[in-house]
A protein has these predicted regions:
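Short hydrophobic alpha-helical segments enriched in small aliphatic residues
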Residues: 8-11
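Short, Lys/Arg-enriched N-terminal segments with co-localized hydrophobic residues
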Residues: 16-35
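An N-terminally biased module of ancient metal coordination in phosphate/nucleic-acid-related enzymes
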Residues: 30-105, 111
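Active-site metal-binding loops of divalent metal-dependent hydrolases
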Residues: 42-43, 106, 209, 235, ...
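Alpha-helical scaffolding within the catalytic cores
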Residues: 84-89, 114-115, 136-138, 189-192, ...
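Active-site gating/metal-coordination segments in enzymes
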Residues: 99-100, 107-187, 194, 230-232, ...
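H/E-rich (His + Asp/Glu) clusters that bind or coordinate divalent metals
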Residues: 213-285
Length: 285
């Protein structure tokens, strides 16, 4: 797996106040020095109480969850009690030499806003956090407490992104970033491009490497040609799970993306802890 350390440096996307410091780290890395490794996409939860459509997702034990009636291995089996804690994450990050991370969210885990605020209070120099957009208004005062906003665009009841422009406007106005997992392929790319052009200063990270295993995924990558739009690879090992490590097709897809938007627009994301059911956190780099 290509370790996109240079791309990860672009966590300027989320580390607003540390931009110059991170930029200097990037220049050092270009000259052969030691760089900072940032995980741009992972998850935390204290208690999992999510949903997929109308179906509930509930943690069981040994890393398993009841996924709308289907039992799935949601986490490594050593996560015994269904909790995916910040303490275990930091331990994994320390071992894998990961300096910082962006904690995103997902409907299948339930809204973790309150827990993430606790996590950042414990480790303010290691993590940035997103509040979860759930197709209803989020007060400015609440958004202000977070670094970004997560939109699970592929799971929205109304998948026309133009009908959600208010949250994009708020993010730009409040100087927050958007972390977004888009619907498969090019289903939402035209609307997304309109929003990018409407809010040109808004910083956006497109997750799951543009849903790289679906037709039209390159259209999502092309969005990163815009100045403040980036692509992150959270979930790419899951999307290519049938071929296993070192994921040669995933490597080819990364090279294709480099040709489309340039390596400086790509960020590494692990999708911890779900992808750790097949590989270790360190291997995901």
């Amino acid at each position: 797996m290509i370790q996109l350390e240079m791309s990860a440096i672009h966590v300027s996307l989320s580390y607003n106040k540390s931009y110059n410091k991170i930029k200097n780290k990037a220049e050092k890395l270009k000259k052969g020095g030691h760089g900072m490794v940032i995980d741009a996409h992972l998850h935390l939860w204290d208690k999992q109480y999510g949903r997929v459509g109308e179906n509930k997702v509930v943690a069981l034990k040994d890393g398993k969850s009841d996924f709308g009636g289907e039992i799935r291995q949601m986490m490594p089996p050593y996560m015994l009690d269904g909790r995916n804690t910040v303490e275990m994450l930091i331990s994994n990050m320390n071992y894998a030499r990961v300096s910082g991370c962006v904690v995103t969210q997902e409907y299948i885990d339930g809204n973790q806003d309150h827990y993430l605020l606790e996590c950042r209070k414990k480790y303010p120099k290691r993590i940035k956090i997103c509040c979860l957009y759930e197709e209803k208004e989020i007060k400015d005062e609440w958004i202000e407490q977070f670094d970004g906003i997560k939109i699970c665009a592929g799971r929205l009841k109304d998948q026309n992104l133009l009908h959600h422009k208010e949250i994009f406007e708020k993010a730009e106005r409040l100087k927050k970033f958007i972390s977004i997992d888009m619907a498969d392929g090019d289903a939402q790319t035209d609307a997304m491009e309109q929003l990018i052009e409407t809010y040109p200063e808004l910083r956006i990270a497109i997750g799951h490497f543009g849903m790289v295993t679906t037709d039209g995924w390159e259209k999502q990558i092309e969005l990163a040609k815009h100045e403040h739009v980036y692509i992150e690879s959270g979930g790419i090992t899951w999307l290519f799970h049938k071929e296993f490590y070192p994921y040669p097709q995933a490597v080819r897809a990364i090279r294709t993306a480099i040709d489309i938007c340039g390596i400086d627009k790509l960020m590494w994301g692990s999708d911890y802890p779900r992808t750790m059911t097949a590989i270790t956190y360190d291997m995901s780099k």
